[in-house]
């Protein structure tokens, strides 16, 4: 028995160490990416050639939009997994990341607005709409994820009844579709290769339509069935925020294409 106890204790320690290493690696990667973006901005500020300044700004916006979609993928996954599996650790991670991203994104946006003032006037006029469309929708995503998170935290933290399995079975394919869209959009933006972007935008619109159908079906269920109203409304609001997230992500992709090309 003592040997078994020691074995399980060792396994527990190894799991804790593995989680610490994974978390530290994630933080190191985030810091390295932010340092790279900051270095790029310093180069942009020192540059006096307008054409070169435009290329530096283009790289900066490409990186920050890539970062926001990576943040969106990770945070959406943590929120939905935390809700479906009643895992407060995932939800706390999402909460921390959202607060962190709010500060990071404000700094990025402020720097890029300065960059827009340094490029050629005609280029700035041409790209201004697409720049602000991307920025505004990135901000919408951050605050939309916060709205999605808050009722999930309240639900799981208070040990309310879990999501019914039929909700989970219905929602998992939606989560997978959203994740795939964000992954491909992130790759397009980071590489500047927008081949197939029109098809991806159509796919994104189809995902939005499927979520809308599920939302309407859920509204009908709430009116028709004698179910747990709190859980039913939580699921409905999660679907609503997911649909809004998809809409904003599509706008970012479309804006990035027009800004970069």
Regions found by a protein language model. Name each.
Residues 1-261:
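Cytosolic, long alpha-helical scaffolding segments
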């Amino acid at each position: 028995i003592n040997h078994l106890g020691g074995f399980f204790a060792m396994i527990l320690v190894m799991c804790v160490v593995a989680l610490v290493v994974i978390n530290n690696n994630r933080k190191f990667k985030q810091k390295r990416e932010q340092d790279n973006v900051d270095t790029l901005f310093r180069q942009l500020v020192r540059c006096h050639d307008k054409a070169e300044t435009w290329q530096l700004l283009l790289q900066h916006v490409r990186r920050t939009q890539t970062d926001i979609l990576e943040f969106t993928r990770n945070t959406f996954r943590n929120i939905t997994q935390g809700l479906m599996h009643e895992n407060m650790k995932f939800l706390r991670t999402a909460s921390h990341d959202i607060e962190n991203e709010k500060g990071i994104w404000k700094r990025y946006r402020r720097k890029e607005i300065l960059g827009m003032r340094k490029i050629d006037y005609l280029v700035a006029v041409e790209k201004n709409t697409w720049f602000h469309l991307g920025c505004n929708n990135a901000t919408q995503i951050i605050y939309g994820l916060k709205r999605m998170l808050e009722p999930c935290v309240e639900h799981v933290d208070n040990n309310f009844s879990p999501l019914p399995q039929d909700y989970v079975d219905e929602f998992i394919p939606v989560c997978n579709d959203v994740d795939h869209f964000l992954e491909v959009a992130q790759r397009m933006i980071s590489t500047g290769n927008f081949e197939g972007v029109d098809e991806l935008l159509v796919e994104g619109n189809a995902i939005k339509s499927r979520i809308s159908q599920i939302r309407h079906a859920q509204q009908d269920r709430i009116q028709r069935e004698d179910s747990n109203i709190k859980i039913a409304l939580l699921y409905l609001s999660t679907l609503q925020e997911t649909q809004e997230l998809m809409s904003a992500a599509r706008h970012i992709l479309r804006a990035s294409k027009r800004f970069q090309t």
